[in-house]
Amino acid sequence: MSIDLNWEAATSGPDGEQLAERIRSFIHDKFQQVPLPRFIRSVNVHSFEFGSIAPELEIKDICDPFVDFYEESDSSEDEDGEGHDAESDTSSDRAADSTADKRDMRYGHDDRGNNGHIPNHHDHLRTSQWVAGGTDGHSTQSPLRSPIGLGDHLNAHFRSTTPNILPGVTSNLGYHLMMGNLSGTQTPLAAVAGGTPFGPGWPDAVMNQGSRMTDHTTGRTRREDHNKNETGSPSRPSTAHTNPTQLSHGRSAASSSNNTSNDPTVIYNDHTSSTTATTYGLHEGGDRPRDKHGHRIDQEEPPPSPTPHMRERRPEDFQVICRVKYAGDVKLSLTAEILLDYPMPSFVGLPLKLNITGITFDGVAVVAYIRRRAHLCFLSPEDADALLGDEDDIQHPSYSTANTTTAASGSSTDNNNNNNESNDHPNHPPQPRRRFGSLLQQIRVDSEIGRKENGKQALKNVGKVERFVLDQVRRIFEDEFVFPSYWTFLV
């Protein structure tokens, strides 16, 4: 069922201008987060226009919303309140947990208010999982893409006797941060800033912890001797027999562009997990952890991973799946500053103006209406094929018959040419036809670089910059709009 869309009413007026400005600002912010190649200094987005050509919409199905749309985020608690302006947000907000819960998990506070208990390896594993962004062993991309700031740890409470922060872990972290042979049993994590417990400017609270640290010396020394015998190095525990922890899960596609391997946070967690396994004898033939008196500590089972809170389904909730075809004149204006390396590196920068004058789009959109929220996303080509492929074959039987006839005649020709090998090499079934290709099939762009002299551009070799900008536009669209990512609008 096809529907008519009043494109002019939806994209013009104050509301249309405000939406266009928000899209421009969103794309501009995304370009500021992209690592630029050496020959590009900066990329700025100046304007965005919807154009005058409306997309073609064909409703394929009306069904119940996807389960992912019912996951409740912090911002959803005010959905029944009053006086809230319409706003949109991506599904990455759903991955953010409350700061108080993370702090309690890190410093060992439980629901009963006990913040001084015997540290075991399960507690520390939960601590390292928190740093990775998840509580079930899988990493969750944090909205903040920078490593953990050292300022959060520069306080007197973060020391080797703090619950859940174990000796050896700080030593290993110190090794990773180029600390040399500073031992975690004598130096708190704050020593990475360049100080020591006996250096100038160190808080007096840490200087007075000598009596407390003496009680734990016996048990700690036993574990350090065990590490020294295995590795021969007092400052770097062995990770030779430790399997790396799985810190990524799910697609990446969407995250093909996410550089998790270069994230310092991921490297930090890999080290801490290895240190935990070495310290507590989790290797093959290792011993169980002991307290300061030499008694074995009973290992508690970790609590089950918390499941996301789901909204309650209502009879009025519905979802529309539609085919979207667009070959319009949407406009996007960008400026990229190119660096010239002659006669010296980064000698001068030339502005390259890129104007995207239109795109060709063919995909499947999903719009779910739940309470006062509308969720919008697009399906990947694989999901669209699985959902609508059979239906397209029914609607276009002649195309499918032609493909079958061609495949049959091709198989007959192969059999005539290879009669002797027909038994050894059976015919392979024909590959299924892809109904949907790339979502953004074509992007039309005009470029202008430098000053024009006599109607001609000073430089014309701008192909690399154009390809980079267009690739980033495709990546931003696929990362932010393709399911399981989606946008939410308050209606």
Curated annotation (Swiss-Prot):
Residues 230-249, 270-279 have a biased composition (Polar residues). Belongs to the MDM12 family. It is a peripheral membrane protein. The keyword Membrane applies. Residues 252-262, 400-421 have a biased composition (Low complexity). PROSITE patterns: SMP. GO terms for biological process: mitochondrial genome maintenance; mitochondrion-endoplasmic reticulum membrane tethering; phospholipid transport; protein insertion into mitochondrial outer membrane. The keyword Transport applies. GO terms for cellular component: endoplasmic reticulum membrane; ERMES complex. Residues 1-491 form the SMP-LTD domain. Residues 72-123, 201-313, 389-434 are annotated as: Disordered. The SMP-LTD domain is a barrel-like domain that can bind various types of glycerophospholipids in its interior and mediate their transfer between two adjacent bilayers. Component of the ERMES/MDM complex, which serves as a molecular tether to connect the endoplasmic reticulum (ER) and mitochondria. Components of this complex are involved in the control of mitochondrial shape and protein biogenesis, and function in nonvesicular lipid trafficking between the ER and mitochondria. Mdm12 is required for the interaction of the ER-resident membrane protein mmm1 and the outer mitochondrial membrane-resident beta-barrel protein mdm10. Its main location: mitochondrion. Residues 83-123, 213-229 have a biased composition (Basic and acidic residues). This is Mitochondrial distribution and morphology protein 12. Keywords: Endoplasmic reticulum, Lipid transport, Lipid-binding, Membrane, Mitochondrion, Mitochondrion outer membrane, Transport. Residues 72-82 have a biased composition (Acidic residues). GO terms for molecular function: lipid binding. Component of the ER-mitochondria encounter structure (ERMES) or MDM complex, composed of mmm1, mdm10, mdm12 and mdm34. A mmm1 homodimer associates with one molecule of mdm12 on each side in a pairwise head-to-tail manner, and the SMP-LTD domains of mmm1 and mdm12 generate a continuous hydrophobic tunnel for phospholipid trafficking. It is found in: Mitochondrion outer membrane; Endoplasmic reticulum membrane.
